[in-house]
């Protein structure tokens, strides 16, 4: 009985350690003067570095929490655009992604099991509240350099 309890305890500890070792990134943005400040976190960790995008002058930002573990940054875009999200690009920049019905996901970023699509970062399961994420593109975004 004691051996079973010890084994169960070890399993629980190892699962917690595994959870904390996840290396996905996600981004938080906030309005700072006429700029958007990007806070980059390792997913489930707290190593933070700050990036500023000088081109983000028109956005007011807020944080959307899908659940306790996943946070996603949302900003209001200028007229003619839908909501957008920040993703990590393959070039290492942190572009602003624009959501627009005319845009579609680049093939390498598609994941048919999820609506939110990014090169790296959290992906949210498909449900009605996430329908707006069906057409996500990193192309033709106003904040890209």
UniProtKB/Swiss-Prot annotation:
Keyword Magnesium set for record: no
Disulfide bonds listed in the record: none
GO CC list: extracellular region
Post-translational modification as stated in the protein's UniProt record: Contains 5 disulfide bonds.
Sorted UniProt keywords: Disulfide bond, Secreted, Signal
Tissue: Expressed by the venom gland.
UniProt subcellular location: Secreted
Signal peptide: 1-18
Protein name listed in UniProt: Venom protein 30.1
